[in-house]
A protein has these predicted regions:
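Lectin-like carbohydrate-binding module/patch detector with strong preference for beta-trefoil
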Residues: 1-156
């Protein structure tokens, strides 16, 4: 597990879309997809808060602040690959860890959560760019946290 600076605001990029796209809260406010990297808004600016489990963080957007966190859909106790934003709470699907993945130094992290375990990683579909969880080792699972002081924010 990697320690992340929780005092910073970030954009999240992956090696599948490289510099062209960043991860953002969708227009309906409940799902995630990759959007044009030139359109940075509060929906695509992220911050992390610590959890009560060492090395795990909650992921929030500036749009919703700490009241909403990235979570895994719990389908009657069955692990899901689907993600959504939910009220922040002590839910294992909101506990995310960043692991060093040294196959690409520009995108050094893979993200997994406590609910589905370290075998399922944050990924995006190649056709829709919608975020989901998947096993394996695919380019959409290699992530970089880019400090927001290096990006230009546009009005939404």
């Amino acid at each position: 597990m990697v320690n992340i600076d929780t005092s910073r605001i970030y954009v999240l990029k992956n090696s599948f879309t490289a510099a062209a796209k960043i991860l953002a809260l969708s227009g309906n406010g409940n799902s995630l997809s990759m959007v044009d990297a030139t359109n940075v808004t509060s929906n695509s600016l992220w911050f992390l808060t610590p959890t009560n489990s060492a090395g795990y963080y909650r992921l929030h957007t500036l749009t919703d602040g700490v009241k909403q966190a990235l979570d895994v859909v719990n389908d009657n106790g069955v692990n899901s690959v689907n993600l959504h934003f939910a009220n922040t709470g002590e839910y294992s699907g909101q506990y995310w860890r960043f692991d060093q993945w040294n196959t690409n130094p520009a995108y050094p992290y893979r993200l997994s959560n406590s609910f589905t375990g370290t075998g399922q990683h944050l990924d995006v579909y190649s056709d829709t760019y919608q975020a989901h969880l998947a096993g394996g080792d695919y380019s959409g699972q290699h992530w970089a946290l880019v400090s927001a002081n290096t990006v230009v924010v546009t009005q939404s």
